[in-house]
């Protein structure tokens, strides 16, 4: 089909969802630029709305990372992995404060996340050494377990409910202070931020500190959704 159409390649959809037809997608020779603000205009509420792009009909695709809850982006060199990772990062930075979302960025290539060095959303400086990456992921596992224990103690199921109750308790404290009364006991403390862990080129980490990294990523992928910790991972090789 690609030969007959003189196209660089085609994609087959068999069937097109909701129909009994087979779809053939042929790339347009004249590419249309997709701008991040245009895609984000379709985003709903929430600090973890991330821009994916546009579909073949030009409709914006935006997803909530809190519901996904983790992302694995794979592809060859030049396929657009880094563009998508940076789009996701910028989607969050444009809509969330450091009190709402914090990042841990792992960059074995040392150049991909260099522009983000020093931003207030970072928990730690951009991690470039494999051993440091292993330690950062181990810390994330410990933080996940600490949060889950705290949720259990407070009788909540996830970070959304915890933060709602924490804000309500803060409002009650402020109202009591204005009335000159002693504030009620607040078992929740401050609202806690989401944590987004972004790893560029996972294969490099797996070759150097595979066992430690694999254990931490597995634990986070299995249990961290309720704790508000999410993974965005890019790799060339599985």
Which positions does each model-derived feature cover?
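Cytosolic ligand/metal-binding cores
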Residues: 1
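Residues at the beta-strand->loop junction immediately N-terminal to the Walker
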Residues: 13, 74
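P-loop NTPase motor-domain active sites and their immediate coupling elements
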Residues: 17-62, 67-68, 99-105, 142-238
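P-loop NTPase switch/communication element
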Residues: 66, 93-131, 135-138
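Conserved beta-strand position immediately N-terminal to the Walker
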Residues: 71
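The conserved Walker
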Residues: 77-78
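Conserved lysine of the Walker
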Residues: 81
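Hydrophobic positions on the alpha1 helix immediately C-terminal to the Walker A/P-loop
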Residues: 84, 88
């Amino acid at each position: 089909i690609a030969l007959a159409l003189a196209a660089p390649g085609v994609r087959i959809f068999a069937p097109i969802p909701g129909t009994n037809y087979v779809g053939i997608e042929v790339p347009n020779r004249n590419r249309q630029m997709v701008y991040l603000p245009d895609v984000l205009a379709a985003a709903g509420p929430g600090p973890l709305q991330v821009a994916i792009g546009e579909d073949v009909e030009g409709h914006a695709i935006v997803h909530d990372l809190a519901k996904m809850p983790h992302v694995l982006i794979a592809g060859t060199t030049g396929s657009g992995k880094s563009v998508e990772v940076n789009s996701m990062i910028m989607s969050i930075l444009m809509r969330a404060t450091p009190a709402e979302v914090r990042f841990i960025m792992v960059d074995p290539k040392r150049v991909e996340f260099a522009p983000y060095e020093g931003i207030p959303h970072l928990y730690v400086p951009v991690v470039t050494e494999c051993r440091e990456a292993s330690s950062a992921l181990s810390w994330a596992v410990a933080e996940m377990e600490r949060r889950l224990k705290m949720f259990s103690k407070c009788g909540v199921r996830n970070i959304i409910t915890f933060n709602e109750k924490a804000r309500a308790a803060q409002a009650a404290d402020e109202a009591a202070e204005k009335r000159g009364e002693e504030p009620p006991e607040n078992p929740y403390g401050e609202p806690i931020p989401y944590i987004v862990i972004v790893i560029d080129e996972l294969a490099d980490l797996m070759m150097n500190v595979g066992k430690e990294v694999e254990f931490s990523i597995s634990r986070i992928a299995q249990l961290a959704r309720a704790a508000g910790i999410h993974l965005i991972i890019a790799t060339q090789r599985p």
